[in-house]
């Protein structure tokens, strides 16, 4: 084999290996919603979105410091005890991992396409064990709340990360098949995003939010921001 052809083949093989280790292409939307019922006041509504939300911007130096100042996932507001479904086929990786937050209970499922899903603020410890196989649409948990009393903040916190390392977070709206624009119209949480007045169009759409690297540099430290009342 000619040396040039040999190098080309080797480069192609290396690229194939690297690409094979990456999560599935973003435009495939391989996952489904983690809830069984249609949205509505008696079932569930969209809560805080993923990314550069106004609330995350306000809490960028505290609650969301580890997420580069952004909200790690998307919240589904629902009464405590609402069934939570696996968004795709996979294997249970962790149950009640303190490392990944979203307490009092959480669950991580590694999916075959290189992604992992984290289900947080669960009502009780999921009745699953690491290594157990689960199917898309299977009930895996119940919604709870971070305050432990289910008085007013019942919701599911859902994250999509890189399987195995869990250091990279992705926008669920780019990976879950759903009409996100319609869902955002009736949610219980405002869908505003913080605005950098020096680049006011950046990160202003549900599906236009950036990936997050855990403990990476802050992405939303703006000299001038909107809304002004949230600045520090």
Language-model features, listed with the residues they occupy:
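Surface-exposed, glycine-biased beta-strand/turn segments
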Residues: 16-105, 136, 185-232
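Conserved beta-strand positions that form and line the central face of beta-propeller blades
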Residues: 75, 108, 118, 142, ...
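Solvent-exposed loop/turn segments at secondary-structure junctions
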Residues: 81-83, 97-100, 114-116, 124-125, ...
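Short amphipathic beta-strand/extended segments with alternating polar/hydrophobic composition
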Residues: 47-49, 54-58, 119-122, 167-179
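Conserved, short, structured surface segments that act as functional micro-motifs
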Residues: 111, 132-202
């Amino acid at each position: 084999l000619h040396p040039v052809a040999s190098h080309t083949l080797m480069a192609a093989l290396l690229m194939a290996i690297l690409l094979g280790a990456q999560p599935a292409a973003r435009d495939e939307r391989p996952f489904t919603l983690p809830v069984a019922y249609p949205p509505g006041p008696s079932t569930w509504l969209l809560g805080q979105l993923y990314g550069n939300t106004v609330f995350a911007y306000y809490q960028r130096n505290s609650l969301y410091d580890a997420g580069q100042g952004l909200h790690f996932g998307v919240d589904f507001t629902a009464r405590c005890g609402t069934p939570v479904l696996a968004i795709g086929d996979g294997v249970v990786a962790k149950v009640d991992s303190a490392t990944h937050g979203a307490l009092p209970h959480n669950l991580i499922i590694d999916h075959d396409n290189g992604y992992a899903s984290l289900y947080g603020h669960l009502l009780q410890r999921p009745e699953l064990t690491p290594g157990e196989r689960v199917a898309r649409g299977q009930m895996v948990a119940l919604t709870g709340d971070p305050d432990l009393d289910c008085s007013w903040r019942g919701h599911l916190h859902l994250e999509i990360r890189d399987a195995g390392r869990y250091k990279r977070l992705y926008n669920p709206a780019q990976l879950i098949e759903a009409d996100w624009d319609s869902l955002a119209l009736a949610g219980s949480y405002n869908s505003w995003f913080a605005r950098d007045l020096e680049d006011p169009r950046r990160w202003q759409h549900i599906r236009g939010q950036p990936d997050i690297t855990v403990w990476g540099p802050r992405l939303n430290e703006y000299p001038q921001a909107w809304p002004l009342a949230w600045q520090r």
